């Protein structure tokens, strides 16, 4: 009997630095092959390891398998030969240092999922990172009562030291969010966020996730919203046709590096007291602006000591800071001078330490001044 197909797991984390050979399972459609990997070969997998969860080197990694087509939550043990039917069940039994491997299919209420899916520390949900989760779809949402933002409808709730890798996330419910991060810092890599009616990802509170190598396409509001005092690292993602690609508000200060943002309404919206840092991004063909700053928002687009190296092409305006009361440091970018509005410091000499800070009495539970499409 053919076993359900799971993507090969060469990319799963390996315990390194032990001076020993390591054994991992390479999973294929019909068989499991044991392969011993030398320390030299382990080094060749460093790129894959960067997308893997932290491991406790003293304990073995556990694998759980899920198939919405042939799995069974009532009788299965989560092995490759006897997979669970739902991610919900796999998360119930998962302990730290567990990877939950998903077979292609749609994971929804119809297949037995209970939303939101609540990630756990030290646990990874992995589909197929090589295709950014094509054909492995988490579809649906449920109510989460956010301490900072009231009731929200979300597909996945993040957790510290958790990972979501190689899946497609879609929340078609009204005001639906794909992944919600409430003062948590998971790693989200090589996923696709599409057709979420509000945002692909929302980070609030003191979240500091790594969001890398994902694709955001045709979301109703924003690709990513960054609120509160969040400081996510947003690297090497693609945002296209997705409202505002990145919406930054309150006192958030994300690092936004080497992303491509095209065909959105606005690529990066900066409002309230937000202080994002943008380096090495390509921002092109956005309908209104490449970067918009309003109120006290102050994006750092480059200083004399740290050039921005952002490329702006064919936007309505490359930088629109006309409604911001801040000087915008913007040294070392490629753009058209007559597509810049507001007080822009092209020499990059602005002293960011002397810029406006929010009043001490201001709370962080406000709602963004502008929401795309809302």
Indicate residue ranges for each PLM-predicted region.
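Short, T/G/N/S-enriched strand-turn elements that build extracellular solenoid repeat scaffolds
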Residues: 87-94, 108-119, 154, 178, ...
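Short glycine/acidic-rich loop motifs that flank beta-strands on beta-rich extracellular proteins
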Residues: 111-114, 135, 173-179, 197-204, ...
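Consensus "Asn ladder" position of solenoid repeat domains
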Residues: 167, 191, 196, 214, ...
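Right-handed parallel beta-helix/beta-spiral solenoid domain characteristic of secreted/periplasmic
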Residues: 122-173, 312-313
